[in-house]
Amino acid sequence: MPSYLTRQKTRQTFSWVGRPLPNRKQFQQMYREICMKINDGSEIHIKVGQFVLIQGEDNKKPYVAKLIELFQNGAEVPPKKCARVQWFVRFLEIPVSKRHLLGRSPPAQEIFWYDCSDWDNKINVETIIGPVQVVALAPEEVIPVDQKSEETLFVKLSWNKKDFAPLPPEVLAALREQEDSPEWQKPLKAKIKNVKSPARNTTEQEVKGIKSNHSTSKFHQTPANIVIPNAKKSLELDGLGFTRKPNTRWSKKSSCDSLDYQKTSKRRAAFSETTSPPKKPNKPREIKPSSALETRVKNGQTQPFCAKSSVVLRARNPAMTTTKLGVDNTLSPIRNGLRSSVVPSGGLTPVYIRRKAKEQETHKEPIRTSRVHRKSSLLTLKRIRQQLCLLDGDDRDQEEEESVDSESEEEDEFISSLPTRNSLGQSRTRQTPSKSPQKNPKPRTPHRATPQIRDRNLAVQEPASALEEARLRLHVSAVPDSLPCREQEFQDIYSFVESKLLDGTGGCMYISGVPGTGKTATVHEVIRCLQQAAETDDVPPFQYVEVNGMKLTEPHQVYVQILKKLTGQKATANHAAELLAKQFCGQGSQKETTVLLVDELDLLWTHKQDVMYNLFDWPTHKGAHLIVLTIANTMDLPERIMMNRVSSRLGLTRMSFQPYSHSQLKQILVSRLRNLRAFEDDAIQLVARKVAALSGDARRCLDICRRATEICELSHLRGDSLSLVTVAHLMEAIDEMFSSSYITAIKNSSVVEQSFLRAIIAEFRRSGLEEATFQQIYSQHVALCRMEGLPYPTMSETMAVCSRLGSCRLLLVEPSRNDLLLRVRLNVSQNDVLFALKEE
């Protein structure tokens, strides 16, 4: 897309054109035209009915609208110049969740007629950037992609916040009638022409002059020190219009080898045309070819010149006449920015090549070219492949072109390092040209691979028993039909978000509660119900964005996640914060309300607390249309860790989720296991009371029940009869869930290992320290074994026991190279060790 006038940072002044049309009822003066003056002296006249660009949040993508009215509001002091417009929307302005409804990827020039009346169509005239051309197309017409249409916008469909639809017939007819009218097109072009900078016009004229004096292939081969915009990449060869320069020598024999499919007469005619010098302006100190040379060129003769007496003519301007044929570039020196015209060229035919040519003509052998001629043939093949690539548009030809480029560069390096003529004549070898073209191996990794989830080969197996069905229903990721025991909290959150959506304002709500009390699940259910209401037009449409502090590597990355989910853009944290601040703090009228859910808010705490401050400050701005729902585990988090300026912006709308009671946990389990007989009633009552007394965490209750079903299945495999989950199964599961893994490991350890742990505690109590050497612990271990009548192990066996307990992280030990003096510590508390070692 072109860069609009907003990027030039010019100052604009607006003035009315013509007499006003008074409107006494509304205290307004209507106008038909307005003049926009720029500080460089140019003027742009804009009339009612034209399409204009309006300043927006993104200077690169301004808003597009059609002027309906131009008026001056006399009720305000001072009077303001205003306009009433019909909005268009770009594809990037449509919510990300609705873009898939288009079914295709639109070009950047396509806009959509906004067919809704909820946006404010009254704007300030000073926000107008300038006129723009908009072309209306039928839905079946194709948008052109040529260079002339880059500054033109096209409209084919309309957008009504729900779906894309073709333009109404009356709208399409009016737009096309306006497009065909010369009143809107010619003045527009004339005015915009004055706005363009003279430097750009001069550059365009120079480019046109260059293109007229040179062929397209020469223009493409311009050196890198001259940058010309809009350079064409077309390449034609010989009869197609390719011209060569007089300083480039091409062997007629190499042309025969590379283009043997053409006729001899056509080849001679093409060669005579290519050797003719192009038209160039007269320059001082320019060397002109002799008449003998001109006669030879006209007759189509390509006799070799003598290296000592002949001089290759070169142009004075290397920027416009030098090609990429690397012989002259590598062998001719450069003095004071100009190539020397008296240095022999690398393209001169050596003596041994002429002798070889005479011998081949005598014996009528096939013509063999040297390395320089092979390079010429390679370059000729390269141009042929480029021409075929432009004509056919085949991607494989482009890959072959790259291989030829690399091969020609290797040839350039080889030629630049060639020895002198005498040494070259001595080391000359016969080389057989390769007949099969070189093929590039295809990369193993595809360039345009689309990541996707692997397809399932087999269907999902149905649960084979009631216990498997119960495990599926009791999983924390299973979505229930309803959320029991949270009806009041659901209604409060729903009413808060619904009121903000209907009023078009923003706000914050802080939700707190211990883990597993249904905070996130309740908010998800509220959003799901609101989205269903938005589809039936009960509430205005909105965008839903969710971020979780646990999934962020750094608190400032929350800006990146929000921007990516809102617009699909990727940016750094600082840039994303600026874009979001511009979006939520701007005065745009065509914004859709955004509902932002921030889970694990306490993990977004920073030293300056700027992340929390911005999240709570954005909804307070007028026109932000942002609703923030924050979730944390601490009830008094705002008072404990937040500054006053942060907690005051959070507001007083807070909600606390209390832990579940045993009756509520029982109701949750019964609702999940509805119409399924897998648990005894006493077992459900037991687990509900146990969990309610400890934490009230519903997730922990579901996990205990799932583990109990697994224990029940294992007992059936050992020979017991398959029955319902009993109290014994649940007690075993509760012991596993609430007991420490260290205690379980100590209980399942061997007798020698348990005796070694008792020796460690005995030594700690004797010395009064929580650290001892292996020698001290070993003496205590031997004494305990004698008291209990057990055979005490040797020093090596005790060292192996110590190492094994250290590998289990029950002990913290030094490396074994310290031997008897290595220090040992407990990695668990002494009370836990004594609790695990007590006899039941």
From Swiss-Prot:
Its main location: nucleus. Residues 418-439 have a biased composition (Polar residues). Mg(2+) binds at residues 599-600. ATP binds at residues 479, 513-521, 600, 633, 699. Residues 480-840 are annotated as: Necessary and sufficient for ORC complex assembly. Residues 44-170 form the BAH domain. Keywords: ATP-binding, DNA replication, DNA-binding, Magnesium, Metal-binding, Nucleotide-binding, Nucleus, Phosphoprotein. GO terms for molecular function: ATP binding; ATP hydrolysis activity; chromatin binding; DNA binding; metal ion binding. Residues 392-414 have a biased composition (Acidic residues). The record marks 93 as: Histone H4K20me2 binding. It is found in: Nucleus. GO terms for cellular component: chromosome, telomeric region; nuclear origin of replication recognition complex; nucleoplasm; nucleus. GO terms for biological process: DNA replication; DNA replication initiation. The modification Phosphoserine is found at residues 197, 255, 258, 276, 291, 332. Residues 195-218, 242-301, 392-456 are annotated as: Disordered. The BAH domain mediates binding to dimethylated histone H4 'Lys-20' (H4K20me2), which is enriched at replication origins. PANTHER family: CELL DIVISION CONTROL PROTEIN 6-RELATED (PTHR10763), ORIGIN RECOGNITION COMPLEX SUBUNIT 1 (PTHR10763:SF23). Component of ORC, a complex composed of at least 6 subunits: ORC1, ORC2, ORC3, ORC4, ORC5 and ORC6. ORC is regulated in a cell-cycle dependent manner. It is sequentially assembled at the exit from anaphase of mitosis and disassembled as cells enter S phase. Interacts with CDC6 and KAT7/HBO1. Interacts with LRWD1 predominantly during the G1 phase and with less affinity during mitosis, when phosphorylated. Component of the origin recognition complex (ORC) that binds origins of replication. DNA-binding is ATP-dependent. The specific DNA sequences that define origins of replication have not been identified yet. ORC is required to assemble the pre-replication complex necessary to initiate DNA replication. Belongs to the ORC1 family. This is Origin recognition complex subunit 1. The gene is Orc1.
